[in-house]
């Protein structure tokens, strides 16, 4: 009887320990945790209480009508100085994202693919990326890549997004078509190997073939340790980049969250039924 009680006690203790370990592991999986985030530009409040949790390896899609705050959310997370955070918090891998400068956020592993990529005349893609890659390595305490090492890395990564080598010799995005600019953004993402990528309407203006190349590049780079936020109006991109979770952002708040089926329902029904549900 005594041995039985001891055995039960040991089993209970082990079970409790396993629960604690599981809880700790679960807790550390949160890559990004946004709580009650409010932000404004000038006197206009745009984000009105965003709550969002993204774990390692997850892809989250954010959809919503025009003017809902989708691009504002990406701008705030990456540190655009035009926006002022008035309330809430954003924790990225255990660190306060809102206290970091934009370049620190990038070096910590945050990447934004712009809806309208900018041109930088006079700065070659090769020099631009070499500076960015080595800056991140310096931040991480790693030595700079030598010229041969960098060229090798660049050649490997451009194959991922099917980017012709001639683009790496040109100025950043100068004279690029819309599709080439978007593909170039994904190439930059491949070079920088971010932990969390934010794709802000990357599919905007792309034909089906260009969209497939971009989506394939994103999928090839996705691992169990990297995550992504895909901001889009269209379900067709989400047929290529499979999200774990789909959110609807409306009037500065996430008003609905579900699985990939939500994107298909929005494609079929639009947003009016969601507006009716939230009573606005």
Model regions and ranges:
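Conserved structural motif at the start of ABC-family nucleotide-binding domains
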Residues: 32-34, 47
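ABC ATPase NBD Q-loop/coupling interface
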Residues: 89-105, 173
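Q-loop/switch helix immediately C-terminal to the Walker
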Residues: 112-116, 122-138, 150-153
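Conserved beta-strand-loop-alpha-helix hinge in the C-terminal portion
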Residues: 245, 249, 253-276
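Conserved hydrophobic segment flanking the Walker A/P-loop of ABC-type ATPase nucleotide-binding domains
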Residues: 54-56
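ABC ATPase C-loop
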Residues: 189-190
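The feature captures the beta-strand-to-loop junction immediately N-terminal to the Walker
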Residues: 63-65
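Walker B catalytic motif
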Residues: 198-202, 209
């Amino acid at each position: 009887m005594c041995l039985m009680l001891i055995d039960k006690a040991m089993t209970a203790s082990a079970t409790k320990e396993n629960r604690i370990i599981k809880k700790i592991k679960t807790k550390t999986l949160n890559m990004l945790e946004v709580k009650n985030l409010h932000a404004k530009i000038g006197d206009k409040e745009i984000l009105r209480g965003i709550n969002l949790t993204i774990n390692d390896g997850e892809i989250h899609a954010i959809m919503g009508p025009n003017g809902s705050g989708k691009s504002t959310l990406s701008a705030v997370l990456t540190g655009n100085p035009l926006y002022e955070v008035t309330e809430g918090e954003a924790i990225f891998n255990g660190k306060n994202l809102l206290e970091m400068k934009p370049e620190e956020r990038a070096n910590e592993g945050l990447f934004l693919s712009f809806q309208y990529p900018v041109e930088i005349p006079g700065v070659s893609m090769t020099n631009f990326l070499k500076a960015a890659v080595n800056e991140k390595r310096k931040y991480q305490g790693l030595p700079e890549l030598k010229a041969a090492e960098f060229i090798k890395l660049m050649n490997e990564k451009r194959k991922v997004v099917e980017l012709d080598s001639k683009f790496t010799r040109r100025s950043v995005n100068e004279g690029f078509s819309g599709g080439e600019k978007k593909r170039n953004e994904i190439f930059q993402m491949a070079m920088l190997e971010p932990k969390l990528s934010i794709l802000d309407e990357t599919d905007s203006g792309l034909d089906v073939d260009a969209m497939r190349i971009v989506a394939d590049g994103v999928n090839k780079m996705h691992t169990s340790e990297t995550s992504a936020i895909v901001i889009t109006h269209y379900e067709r991109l989400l047929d290529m980049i499979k999200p774990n979770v789909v959110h609807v952002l409306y009037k500065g708040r996430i008003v609905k969250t579900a699985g990939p089926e939500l994107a298909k329902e929005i494609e079929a029904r639009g947003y009016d039924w969601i507006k009716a549900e939230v009573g606005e």
